[in-house]
Design a protein with these regions (language model features):
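Active-site cleft segment of glycoside hydrolase catalytic domains centered on the general acid/base Glu
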Residues: 1-100, 107, 113-122
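Short, internal active-site loops enriched in acidic
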Residues: 29-32, 71-76, 215-218, 288-297, ...
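N-terminal substrate-binding region of glycoside hydrolase catalytic domains
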Residues: 1-3, 25, 29-40, 169-175, ...
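C-terminal extracytoplasmic interaction modules
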Residues: 312-435
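Extended hydrophobic secondary-structure segments that form protein cores and membrane-embedded regions
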Residues: 25, 67-69, 210-214, 281-292
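Glycoside hydrolase catalytic-domain groove-lining segments
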Residues: 43-47, 51-67, 93, 98, ...
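Aromatic-rich peripheral "rim/lid" segments of glycoside hydrolase catalytic domains that contact
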Residues: 222-325
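Solvent-exposed, polar/charged alpha-helical surfaces in well-ordered, non-transmembrane soluble domains
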Residues: 9-13, 50-54, 58, 258, ...
Length: 435
């Protein structure tokens, strides 16, 4: 046996020889294997993983948490889409196995559906930008994979969204890969031929925590549209996210991680199990992807040593990026250092990542903020006693008609003023901050 089983047991023995580990995965992202059927409802690889979990337990003992890291499209069931109507919770025998301590999910679920311009569906709903935290969080338990899906590439291009429904059964969560709460808290019933079985599967509702064994987003434009893809010219699986313009964007990666961790950290979004007394999603064990053991900056700089170094620029790597600070946090810090009360500063309208900022001489906080405003393109406005920082280039937030205006006591209702042509700009000059 020189296959997967031997390799996993070899790693388990290495962990044992090293003194043990806190957690161990018997496999990761094997939907092509776990969905193979030897009969209408028999999944031999799932049983093989159960046997493997028992063998790993015999090596590592009860002090190690053992799990399987399922792909986000795999964990919740097998719906082959072959016209049979079959819908099986095929991994439930594994999730329910006493040797499995948690439900592992490699979470790369999309959190946005952003396009060019302001006419696409999400912008038309009033969301200001793809970086907006409330927008991203609205798609953690909503949007694509929860409320609707795209039936084809043509539908995606035209934003023709098909609602996720379940007919007379009224259990749409069965088909929602984002509906973790319903999947975790309900009994599961297989549906051979589309007909619900009379008895539930082995899964006990709320019986085990969910760990996001991977959680990440590439540092590429509109990465949250399709966080699971990566750009690698040498790979046959190289893709850019849907509607990405292909440039580097550290800010969207940071926005994704902040939105996700903060959302699951809220008690209202993460219920407590009545069986084991802890949260559904065990946030402390959610592992952001990816940290590289190779030392930064030698990786990615030494491409003659590591040939994948060029992929770092647009990839999921966090090494070399999390030392940056969000634009909002930096502006807020400068305001507080200037003595402004915290409740008088609103930076929720800012997005961007600042890799470094050097103040070379004595200057006021306002001067420092002005430099940032020129670079990132934002304005400061005072409303209702609060200084609000707002990015430029957003869609219109209000529309005024003549009926909204008050006529002056004297003169015309509307007055047009023409500027002196010699005072208007004669040329446009710009410089590239980062290409």
């Amino acid at each position: 046996d020189w296959g997967l089983r031997r390799m996993v047991l070899h790693y388990a023995q290495l962990c044992d020889a090293a003194g043990g580990v806190d957690a161990f995965l018997i496999g990761t992202e094997m939907p092509g294997l776990t969905t193979i059927r030897s009969g209408a409802s028999t999944y031999p690889a799932v049983q093989a993983y159960r046997d493997l979990a028992a063998d790993v337990r015999s090596i590592l003992g009860s002090g190690t948490k053992i799990g399987y890291a399922a792909d986000w499209s795999e964990y919740f069931g097998h719906q082959p889409g072959d016209g049979s109507g079959d819908a099986f919770f095929h991994l439930d025998p594994l999730w329910a196995d006493p040797e499995i301590d948690f439900v592992g999910i490699d979470n790369y679920m999309p959190l946005s559906d952003w396009r060019d311009g302001f006419e696409h569906a999400d912008a038309a709903e009033g969301w200001p930008a793809i970086y907006d935290r409330a927008y991203l969080q609205s798609n953690i338990a909503g949007g694509e994979g929860f409320d609707w899906f795209y039936a084809s590439a043509t539908d995606r291009a035209a934003q023709v969204r098909t609602p996720i429904a379940d007919g007379t059964a009224s259990e749409p969560w069965v088909f929602r890969y984002k509906d973790l709460r319903a999947w975790w808290s309900n009994a599961h019933y297989d549906r051979p031929g589309g007909v619900e079985s009379g008895a539930p599967t082995a899964w006990t509702p709320q019986s085990k925590p969910i760990w996001f064994t991977e959680l990440g987003c590439p540092a590429i434009d509109r990465g949250t549209n399709q966080p699971n893809v990566f750009f690698d010219p040498k790979s046959s699986e190289s893709f850019t996210p849907y509607f990405s313009r292909g440039w580097r964007d550290d800010a969207i990666q940071r926005a994704y991680l902040e939105a996700t961790y903060l959302w699951w950290g809220e008690a209202a979004n993460n219920p407590v199990s009545s069986l084991y007394g802890d949260r559904m999603v065990h946030v402390p064990e959610c592992a952001a992807w990816t940290w590289d053991a190779r030392p930064y900056p030698f990786f990615p700089a030494l491409t003659e040593v590591w040939t994948d170094g060029a992929n770092w620029r647009l990839g999921h790597w966090l090494t070399g990026r999390l030392g940056a600070v969000s634009l909002a946090a930096l502006v807020r810090h400068l305001c507080l250092r200037a003595g402004l009360p915290e409740d008088r500063v609103d930076v929720t309208g800012l997005w961007g990542a600042v890799e470094g900022y050097v103040i070379t001489s004595l200057e006021s906080p306002r001067a420092s903020i002005t430099t940032l405003a020129r670079h990132f393109g934002f304005d400061a406005v005072e409303t209702e006693g609060v200084i609000r920082f707002i990015m430029r280039g957003r869609a219109a937030v209000a529309t005024l008609s003549p009926n909204d205006m008050v006529a002056p006591r004297e003169g015309d209702v509307l007055e047009l003023t023409r500027g002196q042509e010699t005072e208007l700009p004669q040329a446009l000059k710009w410089q590239v901050a980062r290409a």
